């Protein structure tokens, strides 16, 4: 196993532990708590994939961080922080909408690269909006935290989430997954639109009807997925 993979996991475990202590002291805001909950699932998946114990990894990560901090000067820390571009966290959904449990009458699930797409095939003839919480850097979608499909009544009927065992995805991965979800929902005569915020930062454009400008390749993939998966 690559030692850098192990050390990266160890440091991530320790930093999650520190963030959890911050949350326990009620010092974290809603985006902070969102990321904490999602990262916990990701770490469990990575630990299972790597065959590493999280508690042991956390202790090892603490030693790595302590060693680095002893070597780090305040001036070097300031320069490092100044050179790193800051990402923004955008929220279409409230904390309640993100954390709410939901179930499917006719469940369908598909893995598209590092993302998992879930939808309820029992939903028909509904107006649906896709909302997402995600981070943005350089005015472009950086990391999807969670996307959910809501009916006008507020019911959750679909979802796109990162796979804990496959961390890391691109904006193209997200757009392709959205295309698959839209196609699956429209197969049952639902009308689907995407939130203006998500359109703006994923596609850098927005349409009044809420439809993102899917590429011909995405349309072909969407159509093929509908025929074979839904």
Swiss-Prot record:
Region entry PABPN1-binding, spans: 223-230
Top-rank taxon, per record: Viruses
SUPFAM superfamilies per UniProt: Ns1 effector domain-like, S15/NS1 RNA-binding domain
Molecular function terms, GO-annotated: protein serine/threonine kinase inhibitor activity; RNA binding
Post-translational modification comment from the UniProt entry: Upon interferon induction, ISGylated via host HERC5; this results in the impairment of NS1 interaction with RNA targets due to its inability to form homodimers and to interact with host EIF2AK2/PKR.
Region (Disordered): 205-230
Chief subcellular location: host cell
Compositional bias per record (Basic and acidic residues), positions renumbered to this chain: 218-230
Region CPSF4-binding, annotated ranges: 180-215
One example of a Gene Ontology biological process annotation: symbiont-mediated suppression of host PKR/eIFalpha signaling
Chain location of the short sequence motif Nuclear export signal per the record: 137-146
Recorded family membership: Belongs to the influenza A viruses NS1 family.
Function of the protein: Inhibits post-transcriptional processing of cellular pre-mRNA, by binding and inhibiting two cellular proteins that are required for the 3'-end processing of cellular pre-mRNAs: the 30 kDa cleavage and polyadenylation specificity factor/CPSF4 and the poly(A)-binding protein 2/PABPN1. In turn, unprocessed 3' end pre-mRNAs accumulate in the host nucleus and are no longer exported to the cytoplasm. Cellular protein synthesis is thereby shut off very early after virus infection.
Assembly notes: Homodimer. Interacts with host TRIM25 (via coiled coil); this interaction specifically inhibits TRIM25 multimerization and TRIM25-mediated RIGI CARD ubiquitination. Interacts with human EIF2AK2/PKR, CPSF4, IVNS1ABP and PABPN1.
Protein name: Non-structural protein 1
């Amino acid at each position: 196993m690559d030692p850098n993979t192990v050390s990266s996991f160890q440091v991530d475990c320790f930093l999650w532990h520190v963030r959890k202590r911050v949350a326990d002291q009620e010092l974290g805001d809603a985006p902070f708590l969102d990321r904490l909950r999602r990262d916990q699932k990701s770490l469990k998946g990575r630990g299972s994939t790597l065959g590493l114990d999280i508690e042991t990894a956390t202790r090892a990560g603490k030693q790595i961080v302590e060693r680095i901090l002893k070597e780090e000067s305040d001036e070097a820390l300031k320069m490092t922080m100044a050179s790193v571009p800051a990402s923004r966290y955008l929220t279409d959904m409230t904390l309640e909408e993100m954390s709410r449990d939901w179930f499917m009458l006719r469940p369908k699930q598909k893995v598209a690269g590092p993302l998992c797409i879930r939808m309820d095939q029992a939903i028909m003839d509904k107006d649906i909006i896709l909302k997402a919480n995600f981070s943005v850097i350089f005015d472009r979608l950086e990391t999807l935290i969670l996307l959910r499909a809501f009916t006008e009544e507020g019911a959750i009927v679909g979802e796109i989430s990162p796979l804990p065992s496959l961390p890391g995805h691109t904006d193209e991965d997200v757009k392709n997954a959205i295309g698959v979800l839209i196609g699956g929902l429209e197969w049952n005569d639902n009308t689907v639109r995407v939130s203006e915020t998500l359109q703006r930062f994923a596609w850098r454009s927005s349409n009044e009807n809420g439809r993102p400008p899917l590429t011909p390749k995405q349309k072909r993939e969407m159509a093929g997925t509908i025929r074979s998966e839904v």
